[in-house]
Regions:
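C-terminal catalytic/motor cores of large multi-domain enzyme assemblies
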Residues: 1-199
Length: 199
């Protein structure tokens, strides 16, 4: 790997997200990761630099928000791609994700080479935080940890909450630190106010 990685960690207060996920999954068979992918797609629309690929020493901006979803197989990791993820609602994104993950397990990788951004999630294994390596020629990847129970102090009172740590890795040739921080803050804001994801 010759990509100059820059890492940025944010902690999402995920209580509302977890409650919305529990409420929604009875109608739509979705995962927490589907909400994260949707939040990333929404944020990428605001930050065109995150639609870029670095190829042959050139930055190429894509018109499409194509998001890769990392899938672990027995012999390694593959990244099928949700093409035009920003144009899907939660139901269609969740259904399409299930199809491309199943295809990947059967040896067919959807959208190969079309991705501009990847979401990788190890939360189901209890991993709370980790850093991921960018999937070239993409310029960024978001590593998502488990939602965990925690406490916070509000007006000197202790309250129960849920937290989720995300680590953003960006290619420093394409995206600078300030842009990365703004993007991570946008994803965090969307996930902390997740009702906008099911409108």
């Amino acid at each position: 790997q010759h990509i100059p990685h820059f890492y940025l960690k944010v902690v999402v207060e995920a209580k509302k997200l977890f409650e919305l996920y529990k409420k929604t999954k009875s109608q739509i068979p979705c995962s927490v990761n589907d909400f994260v992918v949707m939040a990333c797609a929404m944020a990428i629309r605001q930050f065109p630099a995150f639609r870029s690929q670095y190829k042959n020493s050139q930055i190429i901006e894509s018109e499409n928000v194509n998001i890769g979803v990392a899938v672990g197989l027995d012999d390694g990791l593959v990244v099928p791609v949700l093409v035009d993820a920003d144009k899907m609602n939660l139901s269609s994104l969740s259904a399409r994700t299930k199809v491309i993950v199943e295809n990947a397990r059967n040896g067919k990788i959807d959208g190969m080479g079309k991705g501009i951004f990847t979401v990788t999630n190890l939360g189901m294994f209890g991993t709370e935080e980790f850093s991921a390596i960018i999937n070239p020629p993409e310029s960024a990847i978001l590593a998502v940890g488990a939602i965990r129970e925690d406490i916070k102090v509000v007006n000197e009172s202790i309250k129960a909450t849920r937290l989720m740590t995300m680590t953003l890795s960006v290619d420093h040739r394409v995206i600078d630190g300030v842009m990365a921080a703004k993007f991570a803050a946008a994803v965090k804001e969307i996930l902390e106010n997740p009702e906008q994801l099911i409108k």
